[in-house]
Amino acid sequence: MIFDTPLQGGQLIRRYKRFLADITLDSGERITAHCPNTGSMMGCAEPGSRVWVSRSDNPRRKYAYTWELVEVAAGVVVGVHTGRANALVEEALLAGRLPALRGYRRVRREVRVVNRPMRADLLLGDHSEGEPDCLLEVKNVTAAVADGVALFPDAVSARGTRHLDVLAAEARAGRRTALVFCVQRPDVREVHPADAIDRAYGQALRAALADGMEAYALQGGPSPEGIELTRELPVHCP
């Protein structure tokens, strides 16, 4: 994924009200940007951090700028725009970068799951070797701790837990279902459920896996030019 227009750099002043961030651009202009991330942004919203924003020319938008990236350590850039995760994963799947899900030639977005309170992020279909369609949920991962471990979620996610329950039920009914973590940071080597943050989510993830849901992780190294998921990481649920 290449950004439509070059990102502008700056320094984070503060994130507040969940969806807003005050930033001083490199030009010296102070702006308020939309923060497209509903989580706690653990370790990714420290005042003074180097950040990058995109700018929209849409006159209907209240905030022209959107926070896209943050540098959390020297040379470690993290993508915080959760709204880009679905497109990044779709791009990677169509390029064959996740071996377990290769062969699907059709992707539908935001597909309602019949008789379930959920829309699947992606529905993979028309497999070249006749494999069943796959309901797929995408989650953006930005949080990490020591030893290269990425964590999800970074805040309690009742909605995420409900979606896992639906995927588990669909798996028990014989459908193929999968969860793909979109890891937008280059400094981690595996993904764990964040039990200390949301124990219910971790329990639901383990239960869904036991019921036949599949779980994968794709990693990319964001830059001000673009983001591409190129590497599969293990999902570890001890």
From Swiss-Prot:
Q: Which Pfam families match?
A: SfsA (PF03749), SfsA_N (PF17746)
Q: Mind telling me what this protein is named?
A: Sugar fermentation stimulation protein homolog
Q: Which Gene3D superfamilies match?
A: 2.40.50.580, 3.40.1350.60
Q: Which family does it belong to?
A: Belongs to the SfsA family.
Q: Which InterPro entries match?
A: SfsA, SfsA_C, SfsA_N
- The encoding gene is sfsA
What's a Gene Ontology MF term here? Answer: DNA binding
Q: Where is the organism placed in the taxonomic lineage, from the top?
A: Bacteria, Pseudomonadati, Pseudomonadota, Gammaproteobacteria, Chromatiales
Which species is listed as the source? Alkalilimnicola ehrlichii (strain ATCC BAA-1101 / DSM 17681 / MLHE-1)
Origin: domain of life: Bacteria
Q: Which HAMAP family match?
A: SfsA
